[in-house]
Amino acid sequence: MYIMNIDAKVRFDPGKALVVKQKHGIDMESVRQEILAGRFDGDEVKNQDGHPGQRMFLVLIDGYVHCVPYVIEADGTYFLKTAFKSRVYQRRYENGEFEIYR
């Protein structure tokens, strides 16, 4: 896990945001606001072969850990790929393995 300061632009694809909202019930703008407010932790995406260069934010939404994979674009913008709930990270969070700063 690592902590980083976000002092940059954060964006997502509006079309993908609709899919995420319908499929997972997650509002990408709420996720974006949590990240901009510094309320997150982070980790690497484990499958770098399938997702080269991706990392992920870990944010708490309604008390549950959500993974938010992202890439950093050439201009330094953080581009959020998707968002999903994670039982694995929720368990690790509950066990105190990392902290999401509120």
Give the role of each language-model region.
Residues 1-102:
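Ribonuclease/tRNase effector modules and their secretory precursors
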